[in-house]
Amino acid sequence: LLTDIDRWNESDEAVTLMTIHSAKGLEFPIVMIVGLEEGLFPLGPQSYEVEELEEERRLFYVAVTRAQQKVYLSYANSRRRFGGHPMPAVQSRFIHELPEELVSVKTGIKAAETAPSLSILR
């Protein structure tokens, strides 16, 4: 049984979407990690158990270290869940744990319409 990652070719100039689990052991020039909000990453109340939270922190480390040159982190200011009304989103605690000297905050062209994005410089 082949997966998309089994057919991945490093020389292809294309965006590759994958889970963090399937990215283990691979590296890419640029990595984009989306959904870095409390309740998504880390997942939620079950992640407040020390062991589960540490596992999610390790997964975040895996995701960040897949980047050879740059990593872009993004989060939403608000999110609609299960067809409901937009709810305010809180930036993931993992972003705040990164060394400040490695983080550069960038905002979109129209800050009111786009959420801030972060870049980790290597």
Region locations from a protein language model:
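Conserved helicase C-terminal RecA-like lobe
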Residues: L1-L102
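Acidic, low-complexity intrinsically disordered tails
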Residues: L98-R122
